[in-house]
Design a protein with these regions (language model features):
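Short clusters of small/polar residues that mark proteolytic maturation junctions
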Residues: 22, 32, 104, 175-176
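Hydrophobic residues embedded in beta-strands of well-ordered beta-sheets
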Residues: 27, 99, 170-171
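Short, surface-exposed beta-strand-loop junctions and turns on beta-sheet-rich folds
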Residues: 37, 107-108, 179-180
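Short histidine-centered catalytic/ligand-binding loop motif
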Residues: 42-51, 100-112
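Non-catalytic substrate-recognition/targeting regions of SAM-dependent transferases
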Residues: 83-87, 91-93, 113-180
Length: 180
């Protein structure tokens, strides 16, 4: 949080990934910064020498999917759950063959294309094809992060009414106008 930061050294832009240290200079890991946010730094890793690159993002996405495969028996689930999956500020739900993404932090918003690309790749390795992605990043908190509210297709448009199966029961979900 902003009140826990003593100083920020070096040049950066909001959304950049920085090394984080405690008051004695001991490395705490890496996180992305946004001085406009009350949560000034969102930690991506507690490992001090980690490089947050495409391979790192793929590892985080793969770990999240591997965990979901052991706990979920449905055509739909929350694939990425922000901080719980060490990808703070982003939630990605799978409704059958459609992904719905909500990005609430500037730093993760910058990584959103890579996260979605790696997620599609990891799912494809298990024979899961994604026909479309819809963004529901329209929460007011985005304004506090210095971002616009966004709602719409990422890529080609598709029918936003999706049939899912949960516990043997079929449901119709409207990813565009339904509950996020």
């Amino acid at each position: 949080y902003d009140n826990e930061i003593e100083r920020i050294e070096g040049e950066f832009e909001n959304g950049d990934i920085l090394r984080v240290e405690d008051f004695d200079g001991y490395p705490l890991g890496c996180g992305f910064i946004n001085t406009r946010s009350k949560i000034t730094v969102r930690m991506m890793t507690r490992k001090k020498d980690t490089v947050v690159d495409d391979a790192f993002i793929e590892m985080r996405v793969r770990d999240a999917w591997e965990y979901r495969k052991t706990t979920v028996d449905t055509s739909s689930c929350r694939l990425i759950f922000g901080e719980a999956d060490f990808l703070p500020g982003i939630v990605i739900d799978k409704f059958s063959d459609v992904l719905v993404v909500e990005s609430l932090a500037l730093g993760i918003d910058c990584l959103k294309p890579v996260i979605l690309d790696k997620l599609k790749k990891v799912l494809a390795e298990d024979g899961i094809s994604i026909r479309g992605v819809y963004e529901r990043s329209d929460a007011k908190v985005r304004l506090q992060e210095g971002m616009e509210r966004v709602k719409g297709f990422i890529g080609e448009p598709f029918d936003t009414k999706v049939e899912i199966v949960e516990n043997g029961v079929r449901y119709m979900v409207d990813v565009q106008d339904g509950q996020k």
